[in-house]
From Swiss-Prot:
This is Cytochrome c oxidase subunit 2. Its cofactor is Cu cation. Keywords: Copper, Electron transport, Magnesium, Membrane, Metal-binding, Mitochondrion, Mitochondrion inner membrane, Respiratory chain, Translocase, Transmembrane, Transmembrane helix, Transport. InterPro entries: CcO_II, CcO_II-like_C, CcO_II_C, Copper_CuA, Cupredoxin, Cyt_c_oxidase_su2, Cyt_c_oxidase_su2_TM_dom, Cyt_c_oxidase_su2_TM_sf. It catalyses: 4 Fe(II)-[cytochrome c] + O2 + 8 H(+)(in) = 4 Fe(III)-[cytochrome c] + 2 H2O + 4 H(+)(out). Mg(2+) binds at E199. The gene is MT-CO2.
Length: 228
């Protein structure tokens, strides 16, 4: 969960966010190395006799270097990116499917694998919050899923564009009216994870939070029974 004055990414709570952080660190390292090399060459060229060389002189080694180097950098950036994109999109034998539908300005969740459960999830007003509950993030009815098992979330919208997002899990998918988008969702631990609609969708866009609770499997099965 984010906190005040936070400069870093949120702690990874699932395999998708771990991939996102790895890719971020990988690209950041390449960027720092490129910056150092370019700075070194710039300082060298402006402070040594290299600046007095004939600019029309052909230097085949340099031409080869500034052709091959960018290609290698792009390859080193692209390969991890493609891997991460694949893992973020592919769903492997999900234990459960949940449909999330965006409305102005709340979410509806529907469970249909062997059960028929549907409920709306509204933000709790500040004056009604319990002590310790996060402001503008807590809802009256959380989405619940089993921890440690992959869940498929199918996302759509009823009226305008929305976006279903939980930063600590590294997931963000657009909710488009008339279209179904899916994403794999898994957590590495039990807990409550918060997000918000990340697509401007009207006057109350800022008051459309997402709260997902990951519980042990036996607790989740008990919750399913209680909701029927």
């Amino acid at each position: 969960m984010p906190h005040a004055s936070q400069l870093s990414l949120q702690e990874a709570m699932g395999p998708t966010m771990e991939e996102v952080i790895f890719l971020h660190d990988h690209v950041l390292l390449l960027t720092c190395l490129m910056t150092m090399v370019i700075t070194m060459f710039t300082l060298t060229a402006t402070t040594t006799a290299l600046t007095h060389n004939d600019p029309t002189e052909e230097v085949e080694q340099l031409e080869a270097a500034w052709t091959v180097a960018p290609i290698m950098i792009l390859i080193l950036t692209a390969l991890p990116s493609v891997r991460s994109l694949y893992l973020m999109e592919e769903v492997f034998n999900p234990y459960l499917t949940i449909k999330a539908t965006g409305h102005q300005w709340y979410w509806n969740y529907e469970y249909s694998d062997g059960v028929k459960i549907s409920f709306d999830s509204y933000m709790i007003q500040t004056k009604d919050l319990q002590n310790g509950s996060p402001r503008l993030l807590e809802v009256d009815h959380r989405m619940v899923m089993p921890a440690g098992l992959q869940t498929r979330v199918v996302v759509t919208a009823e009226d305008v564009l929305h976006s279903w997002t939980i930063p600590s899990l590294g997931v963000k998918v657009d909710a488009v009216p008339g279209r179904l988008n899916q994403l794999p969702l898994a957590t590495s631990r039990v807990g409550v994870f918060y997000g918000q609609c990340s697509e401007i969708c009207g006057a109350n866009h800022s008051f459309m939070p997402i709260a997902m609770e990951a519980t042990p499997l036996h607790h989740f099965e008990q919750w399913l029974i209680s909701e029927q």
